[in-house]
Curated annotation (Swiss-Prot):
Protein name: Islet amyloid polypeptide
Positions of region (Disordered): 64-93
PANTHER family in the record: CALCITONIN-RELATED (PTHR10505), ISLET AMYLOID POLYPEPTIDE (PTHR10505:SF4)
Underlying gene: Iapp
Intrachain disulfide bonds: C39-C44
Self-association state and partner proteins as the record states: Can form homodimers. Interacts with IDE and INS. Interaction with INS inhibits homodimerization and fibril formation.
Compartments in which it is found: Secreted
Location (main, coarse): secreted
Annotated organism of origin: Mus musculus (Mouse)
InterPro entries from the UniProt entry: Calcitonin-like, Calcitonin/adrenomedullin, Calcitonin_CS, Calcitonin_peptide-like, IAPP
Length: 93
């Protein structure tokens, strides 16, 4: 029982420690696409930890289902596809 009460404090300390980390640098000039994809390790880890804490804590309210924010979710545009000609019919009038 005592171990469970110390868990939030340990996770908070871990969050602060991860917040000060930096991602290992990629060689400059190697690949511009890789430079765009670089992730700040501290930011990613902190966000994952925050999501874990929100979903695992019963004291803070209801446990919310994970949000669907992927690239194939409703409302996203298909950037690779051609524009739909039927949707452009109103321009011809």
């Amino acid at each position: 029982m005592m171990c469970i009460s110390k868990l939030p404090a340990v996770l908070l300390i871990l969050s602060v420690a991860l917040n000060h980390l930096r991602a290992t640098p990629v060689r400059s000039g190697s690949n511009p696409q890789m430079d765009k994809r670089k992730c700040n390790t501290a930011t990613c880890a902190t966000q994952r930890l925050a999501n874990f804490l929100v979903r695992s804590s019963n004291n803070l309210g209801p446990v919310l289902p994970p949000t669907n924010v992927g690239s194939n979710t409703y409302g996203k545009r298909n950037a690779a596809g051609d524009p739909n000609r039927e949707s452009l019919d109103f321009l011809l009038v």
